[in-house]
Amino acid sequence: MEITLKSGEVSAKITSKGAELKSLKVGNRELMWSADPAFWGKTSPLLFPMIGTLKDGKTLINGSEYKITKHGFARDLELTPEDFSSTSAMFSLTQSDYTKAMFPFDFRFTVRYTLKADGLTVTYRVHNNSNSDMPFCIGAHPAFATPGDMTDYRLEFPKLETAAVPNYNLSTGLHEENNRRPLIDGDTVLLLSHEMFYQDVCYFDKLRSRSVQLLNKENVGVRVDFPDFTSLGVWQAKDAPFLCIEPWCGSADFDDCSGVFAEKRGVEILPPDGEKAFTYTITAIELKAKV
C-alpha cells in the first residue's frame, strides 16, 4: 500500500512495506533517490531494532543468544497505516513470533511523517511493553539524489568538526576502533567524492553538530536536522548518484565489543512501559551565492 501526502507544493509518498519514504518533492524538485536497483534498490529504510551487523552474526540478550538481521527487521515488514490525513501519516509495528525469534521483547514502534512548508518531519516512537528493560538501536537511512559530479557536493555542519571515522571492515562487517581515518579537522565543510565511500559507511560517532547540509556548487540541496540522535552515518553505493545522511542511535558492532546487545555503542534502553521519541527533519534549501 502506498500513501501520498500533499500540502501546497510539497508532496511525499510512503509505502507500507517498511513504512519507507519513496518520494519527497518540494515544487518540481525531487529530493530523494530513485531506488534504481542498478545501484541500490531502496530509498529510505527504517533501522530498528538494529543498525548494521553483529559481531560473529550474533548477540546476547538477557543471557541468551540471538541473531538479528542486518539493520533490523522493521524495514522488511509490513507496517500498519493508521491515523493519516492529507498531510500526515503514521505507521505502526508490534512484536510477532517472527520478531521475537530475533528480539525477545514486546514493543510498539511507530513512525509518523508530517509535511512542512519546505520539507518533511519524521518521528519514530518506541514503547516497551515488556516487563524488563529493552535495549534497541534506531536510525534513519534517507538517500538524497546527487545528480552530476560528486565532487561538486559538500557537507556543511553548523559547528566546527574534527572527525576521524572508524574503518568499516568489509569482510567482518565491523567498525575498527583503532583504525580510523581523518575526514575533517577543525572545519565546518567536508568536500565529497565517490572514493570517500569505497570502504563503505563514514560513521561520525563523535559529531558535535546535530544538523548537516548537503549542497552542490549552486548551493542547492537539503538540510537534515537530527536533535534526538547521537551519531551520523554517511554512505553511498559505489559511484552512485545519491548520498545517504543517516541519523543513528547505535551502529554496527565494533571489533572490540563485548557481544552483549545492551552494551552496544549508542544503544538506547527503555524501562518497562517506557517510551521515547526520535525526530529528524528534511528541508529543501537553496542558499544565496556566497559573496
Give residue ranges: language-model regions:
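Acidic-aromatic substrate-binding/catalytic surfaces of carbohydrate-active enzymes
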Residues: 11-65
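Extended, loop-rich substrate-binding clefts of extracytoplasmic carbohydrate-active enzymes
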Residues: 68-117
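Beta-strand-rich interaction surfaces with strong enrichment in secreted/lumenal proteins
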Residues: 110-112, 265-270
